[in-house]
């Protein structure tokens, strides 16, 4: 199939909510980037595909881990053994998905990107998938995943701060996810709040320069930054258990 046909099939798979197949079609497209960089549309389709595939497993993992904690609290050892085994199966799927996109980013997408916007997009994506690994890995593997996340986000941030406007949806999405990393993986609420607040304040001060095409995307991410700040600042004073927001919607909202 041609590049155009693979893109069309990826859109069809998205409509049918068959995200594993959407990933397959977009991987074929991504492997042609030696010739030509992915378009914004193609880049977003790839991101949406992977985000849905990983998102389902991340949700499953959280539910199963929560049940495991409850069963441990009840002293239900037989159930705990079964749950651990099942959780291991989900973790194997998570690892495979993350490894797939990280290989693709390293072999094709990051090296072929020339524009600042696409470099930040792919490096942010690299950070995101290392972060997803850090969510469930333990010991040395978790440390390695966290370090790789930091390196990717930092590289993306350096380019974003130099070349993208504070209101740019990709720069904002990066700040959002980087701050989530500080909060959830590194357990650094102060750093998380500072990063999110700075990104929000800088964007607010330049809101009047925002073009119509990215206004919706940028303001949506700014709202998520503010939601997290509210949650985190209340968490610093009390132990809250609400859900942290990250750049989701398949990350497509950041790439317009």
Swiss-Prot record:
Entry's localization field: Cytoplasm; Nucleus
Tissues expressing this chain: Expressed in seedlings, internodes and panicles.
SUPFAM superfamilies referenced in this protein's UniProt entry, alphabetically: 14-3-3 protein (SSF48445)
Record keyword Nucleus present: yes
Major place of residence: cytoplasm
InterPro entries recorded: 14-3-3, 14-3-3_CS, 14-3-3_dom_sf, 14-3-3_domain
GO cellular component terms given for this protein: cytoplasm; nucleus
Conditions for induction: By wounding, drought and salt stresses, benzothiadiazole (BTH), ethephon, methyl jasmonate (MeJa), hydrogen peroxide, abscisic acid (ABA) and incompatible and compatible races of rice blast fungus (M.grisea) and rice bacterial blight (X.oryzae).
GO biological process: protein localization; signal transduction
Pfam families xref list: 14-3-3
UniProt entry keywords in alphabetical sequence: Cytoplasm, Nucleus
SMART domains reported for this sequence: 14_3_3
Free-text function comment from the UniProt entry: Is associated with a DNA binding complex that binds to the G box, a well-characterized cis-acting DNA regulatory element found in plant genes.
Complex formation: May form a complex with the transcriptional activator VP1 and the bZIP transcription factor EMBP1.
Membership in a protein family: Belongs to the 14-3-3 family.
The protein's name in its UniProt record: 14-3-3-like protein GF14-C
